Amino acid sequence: RCADPARPGAMGDRLRERIALITEHGGYPAEGFGFDLNGFAGAPGPRFGPNTECGATPQANPVTYPFTSYAGDVTFTQPNLGARAVDFNTEGMLHVGLLPELIEDARRDGVTDAELEPLFRSAEAYLRMWERAETRAAALRAR
C-alpha cells in the first residue's frame, strides 16, 4: 500500500487489475472487501513514521483533517480513542473505523473517484451474483 513517487495512483493498481479481470469475464464491475475482525495483524500499516511499512521509499500526501467523504456528504475530523488522537499516517489502520482514512489515503495518492467507484457498488454486485445463483439453482432443479 506504499505510494510510488514515480507513479501517482499506484495504490490503486490491484483494484484496477481486479476490476479489469471481472469486466473481462463479463462480471459486474464491483469489488467487495472486508477485514478479519478477529485481529488486525494483516491490516494496512503506516506509510509514515518509525513503523512505516514502506522502507526507504519516500512517501508524500499524508491524510490530513478535515477531509470529505467519497460521496461528499460527510466531513471527517481527527479520530480519537478516548483522549488519545489516532494518527492513521503513523499508526496505520488500527480499527475498522479508519476505513474512510484508508480510502482517503488512496485518493491522496492519485487514485481517482471513478477508480474507487467499484468499492461502492459491492452490495449491488453481491445481489446480482445471488440472483444468478438462484437462477442457476432453479435451472438445475428443473432438470
Where do the PLM segments sit?
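Mid-to-C-terminal alpha-helical segments outside catalytic/metal-binding sites
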Residues: 61-143
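Structural alpha-beta junctions
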Residues: 21-29, 108-114
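Short acidic/histidine-rich active-site segments
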Residues: 26-45
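Short secondary-structure boundary/capping segments
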Residues: 47-52
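C-terminal regions of proteins
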Residues: 22, 34, 103-106
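Catalytic pocket-lining loop regions of alpha/beta-barrel enzymes
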Residues: 1-26
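Sequence contexts marking disulfide-bonded cysteines in secreted/extracellular proteins
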Residues: 3, 53-55
